[in-house]
């Protein structure tokens, strides 16, 4: 789906039918730049002021602890991907900056650990709420249109027909809403732990 949207944020992932624990998937390893994370939890004074953030709580010294993410355009695309995929577990540690082996090692943003996606019930939990309520850009509307046009056969053997329908309904709902979703208030908005 990441490729269909034209964002290519998910590393190469392949199905493995005969793994040691049975069927599953494997994903290309990405060496993460741990010195420059795009999502951070820290004392609020140490978080970059131009980042999207909110208060998590206070520490034992009564200092405010915040969670913030970069305004990087790839994260905005990832937030849209997660909304359509219904990602129930987008933690900060699942957002990496690392070399793209297919582009001579050029650094890029990667989204890993996408195991809790495509459920038919609403389950979106993410650390990437910084664009909640912001209008969709024309290119983002085009990404959602691409999802609506995916042939069922492209999903065959990967997700169920009910999950395919749910993906399309979420894409259509976002197009009709015209903006990024926000927390519903009906369930936890953040995965735990957030990083």
Short names for language-model regions:
Residues 98-195:
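C-terminal catalytic region of ATP-dependent kinase domains
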Residues 93-97:
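Hydrophobic residue at the +6 position relative to the catalytic HRD Asp in the kinase catalytic loop
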Residues 72-77, 108:
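Alpha-helical scaffolds flanking conserved acidic
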Residues 85, 92, 116-117:
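Short, glycine/acidic-enriched loop or turn micro-motifs at the edges of active sites
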Residues 59-63:
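Glycine/charged-rich beta-loop-alpha catalytic/anionic-binding loops adjacent to active sites
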Residues 1-52, 58, 80-88, 99, ...:
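Conserved ATP-binding subdomain of kinase catalytic cores across diverse folds
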